[in-house]
Amino acid sequence: MNYQLITTDAGLQQVCDQAKKHAQIALDTEFVRTRTYYPQLGLIQLYDGEQLSLIDPLPIKQWQPFIELLSNTQVVKFLHAGSEDLEVFLNAFKTLPTPMVDTQILAAFTGRPMSCGFATLVAEYMEVELDKSEARTDWLARPLTEKQCVYAAADVFYLLPMAKRLVQETEEAGWTAAASNECLLLCQRRSETLAPELAYREITNAWQLRPRQLGCLQKLAEWRLRQARERDLAVNFVVREENLWQVARHMPTSLGELDSLGLSGPEIRYHGKTLVALVAEAAELEESALPEPLPNLIDQPGYKKVFKEIKAAIVIASEQSGLSSELLASRRQINQLLNWHWKLKVGDNLPELVSGWRGDLLAAPLQDILKGY
């Protein structure tokens, strides 16, 4: 397996010019994310069927050729389980690969488990056992070892031929349009960014709080998310989620009270005064400015019963279509549908279970069930 390590702008330009001539390329990324909010890009792997390149992002300055390749609609980009890679591209280049085909999604449409691993598919299609010993390596350390480079190169070297076969199988099974729709949905989900003022809704057990406490949590969660993004620090390294909830619940007025709520020394040292000030702001809010209480979906009358009925309808659709129940509907998607039906959460888009390719299979039976609730 021959590869070239790309460390210059001119080298990247040559790789992208060459890749543009191909209808399909395989892409992968290696990144590190331990304490940071954003993934830190350590390596990009690109294989166009002729040339396998390991692109070192640390010395490269001129990314325009790569950004143009990502958005070149004449070149299909294959990724495997690409959700995190999409986040990396979005963060580093403000661009998603278009069009993008995720081979894990193709595998699911050809009868394999929903989260079929890359190594499993490579063993099946290429009859090669991949060495995964470098999976947890530090991709920001330099120089990269030969072992790291071979590991990284294998990810795209086997991905491209395997992807071509999966595309063919998906086509033969009649699911090409649905698989494309699912890949698009993955890109859509990745493009959605959480508005800081709505971050409080994502905090576990936020529904247990009264409006005044919720108003406090809204201020705290917005501040924490903005801090995390500005300082590129994982949210729980700013203030842990359970501690944020405790502050909102008890609305302390002093640093001593923060200590008794169980906040860590560094949390109090760095952010104690800010937290107490935000609590004071929340205490002053007009009643009319407080958020509505958050309904808890699973406490809704009939939740368990309707959930069970929906699951049963999905099993029937799975048997009829030959697609797994996991692919057809996740718990998140069922809850999204019920939140929409009961108007507990307002979104711009129709729920995934009654739109796109899933809607073709599920909308009619699910709407029949929902009429009873």
Swiss-Prot record:
Catalytic activity: Exonucleolytic cleavage that removes extra residues from the 3'-terminus of tRNA to produce 5'-mononucleotides
Places the protein is found: Cytoplasm
Keyword terms of this UniProt record: Cytoplasm, Exonuclease, Hydrolase, Nuclease, tRNA processing
Residue span, HRDC domain: 210-289
Pfam families for this protein: DNA_pol_A_exo1, HRDC, RNAseD_HRDC_C
The EC number(s) this enzyme carries: 3.1.13.5
InterPro entries: 3'-5'_exonuclease_dom (IPR002562), HRDC-like_sf (IPR010997), HRDC_dom (IPR002121), HRDC_dom_sf (IPR044876), RNase_D (IPR006292), RNase_D-like (IPR051086), RNAseD_HRDC_C (IPR048579), RNaseH-like_sf (IPR012337)
Keyword Cytoplasm: yes
Origin: domain of life: Bacteria
Domain 3'-5' exonuclease: 3-171
GO molecular function annotation: 3'-5' exonuclease activity; nucleic acid binding; nucleotide binding; ribonuclease D activity
Cofactor(s) needed: a divalent metal cation
GO biological process, one term: tRNA 3'-end processing
GO cellular component annotations of the record: cytoplasm
HAMAP family, sorted: RNase_D (MF_01899)
Record family assignment: Belongs to the RNase D family.
Function of the protein: Exonuclease involved in the 3' processing of various precursor tRNAs. Initiates hydrolysis at the 3'-terminus of an RNA molecule and releases 5'-mononucleotides.
Name of protein: Ribonuclease D
Organism from which the protein derives: Serratia proteamaculans (strain 568)
